[in-house]
C-alpha cells in the first residue's frame, strides 16, 4: 500500500451547497477511467485511492492517486472484480465513497449492496436500479411498461444451441444474440442463418460466463441499417431527472464503439425530445439516481427502439461534457453525497459539436486484432480548452492559458483521456483501449478538422494501434456526410483495413513537404560530411519524389522563410515548417494550410504517416530516380497455405483435424485474446495437412496454427 502524498494535504471537505463532502473516495477501476475520476475529485478537493493488480503496479492511475492499494494478480477475476479485495482496500484506507468507473464491478448489485452494508457511499445508482437494468430481459419488460419503444424478441431463458436456432428462425433472421448481463460488445453476435445462430449462441455464452459470470442469453430481432443513438440522463435522490442530449455511436466494430459524437447529425429537435423524455421516464420508473445512459437503435425513418440502460458512466461521456459544459463525474459525486441537482431541463443547452476517437491497441492491418507490448513512444497532441466546459470552468487538468499547438485552431478544443504513458506496458489482461481523443468545435466541420489534425499529431510506437484507421474514417465521405449506420466498418472495410490512398492534391502536398524536409536533411549532411574547405558537398535543387506509385520531378527553391516547390507540370507549393532531422513529427504549412506528418527514416527518404495513409517516400536526384526504376522489388514470403495466429492469444478450440477437407468460411480455430473469442475461418476450400498448435496453447503473432495442402 502506498500512503498519501503531498497532493492529499489542504483539501476542503465541503460541497458547494455547504454540506459536508466526502473526504476520500476509492476508485474501483484502472486505466483511463480511473485517471478521469481522479481529475474531477482533485478539482473538488477530495483525496483519492487507487487499486491495482500486479500488471498495473506502475500504472498512471496509481501514480496520480493520493494512495494506492495492491489487490492481487493481473487477472481481473482475481483482483478488480473480487468484491472482498475492494472492501479490504476500503477498510485499509478509510475511503468514504467508491466510484466504480465502467466495466468490472460498476454494474454489479452485490458490490453496491456490500458498500451499503459497510456504510460506504456508492457513486452510482441504487442497487434496485442496477438489478432492474442490468438484466437485459428484465430491463426490456420494464422499459415497455414505462412507455419506451422496444424491439421484438424472445425474453425467456434459452437452454442450448438448438433451442437458440429454433427461436432465431421463429423471430426471423437476422437476429441479435446477446448476453443478458453483457455490455461493451462482449457476449453479442449477429446471426444471419441457423449455423451462425448455433455458433453465435455458444460464443456469446462462453464470453458472457468469462466476462460477467452469468451465461444467460436472449435473442431479439436485429434491425438492419440501424444507427446507435443513446441518451445521457442525470438524476438525484430527490426525484429530479434530466436528459443531456444524445450521442451518436454508430461507428462500431464487433458491437464495440470506435467513434462517437454529440449531437447526432441525424436527429431533429422533435425526435431528440421524444427520446429524452422516454429515457427520463425509464430512469424514474426504477428510482434512478446518478448518471446513466439509455441506448436506442434507430432505423432510417427515425423509429427508435430501446436496447439497454447502462447504469454507470459511459466510456464516451466526454462528448456530452464538451457540448453541455457539465462535468458528469462531479455530478455523480454530488448526487452520491445527497445533493439536489443544480441543473433543470431548461438549463441544458447543446453548444457546438464534439467527437471522440477511441485509440485501441489493435492492428487495423490485421483485421483489428489486439496488440500488446511496450509503448516505446506515446506523445498525444497538446490539449487545448475551448467551448462550454471552459466557459463553465469545468475543464480539468488543462491550464487556462494553454497555448495551442501550431496544428490547432484556437476556436477548437482538444482533450485526451488516457491511462498510459510512454514506456508503459499494454497488457493482454485488459481492454485494449489506451486513450480517448476528443475534439470540440463550434460546428461539426470544425470538430472534424480538429480531430484530423489531432490524430495526425498523435505519436504512438511499439504496438499496433488504430490511429491510421481513425484518420481514414474522418475523411470518409459517408462519415463526413453523417450517412452512417452500425454496419459502416463491415460495409466499407469488409476485408479489413489496408490503409488509404491519398487523393492527388493531398499527395502533392505531402510530396512538396518531403522535398522541403529532404533539403533540410541534405544541408545538414553537407555540413557534417567532413569535406575540405572550398570542396563542400553541393545541395542540388532538382529532385524526384516517389510515393504511392507515382513520382514527381520538381525544383526546390529555398529561402529564409521556407521553400517554393515547383513541379514539372508548372504547379507550385509554398512550404514552411519547424522540422529538423531526427524529429518524428513534422508540423508543416503548405500553401497556408497546416499539414502534420509522422516521420520515420528509410533509406533514401522517409516513412510518412498522415490522414490514414502509410507512405514510403523516396527523394532522389534525377539520376538516382532513373536507376531506381530498373531495380526489382523483393517479394513477401508465401503464407497462403498456412493459418497464422493473427494476435497473441490462447487457443480455445480447434474445429478441424489433420486430413479434414474444409470449405470456404468454415471455422478452423477459436483464439481468445483480451477477453474476446475470435473464430478463424478458412479463406478457401482446402485440405488440412498438419496441425501445429493444440487447445490451451498460448501463441504469438504469426505462429502457424495449421497448414494446408
Regions found by a protein language model. Give the residues of each.
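Catalytic cores of soluble metabolic enzymes centered on carboxylation/carboxyl-transfer
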Residues: 279, 318-573, 667, 701-707
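Short, low-complexity intrinsically disordered segments enriched in A/P/G/S/L with frequent Arg
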Residues: 8-12, 405
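Conserved nucleotide-binding/hydrolysis modules and their immediate coupling elements
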Residues: 327, 558-563, 568-585, 589-596, ...
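N-terminal beta-alpha lobe that positions the nucleotide/phosphoryl donor
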Residues: 15-294, 298-317, 323
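Long, charged amphipathic helices and adjacent flexible linkers at domain junctions
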Residues: 343-351, 491-493, 497, 531-532, ...
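Structured, non-catalytic alpha/beta "coupling" segments that mediate domain-domain communication
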Residues: 107-114, 356, 366, 591-622
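Structured functional modules or segments
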Residues: 635-709
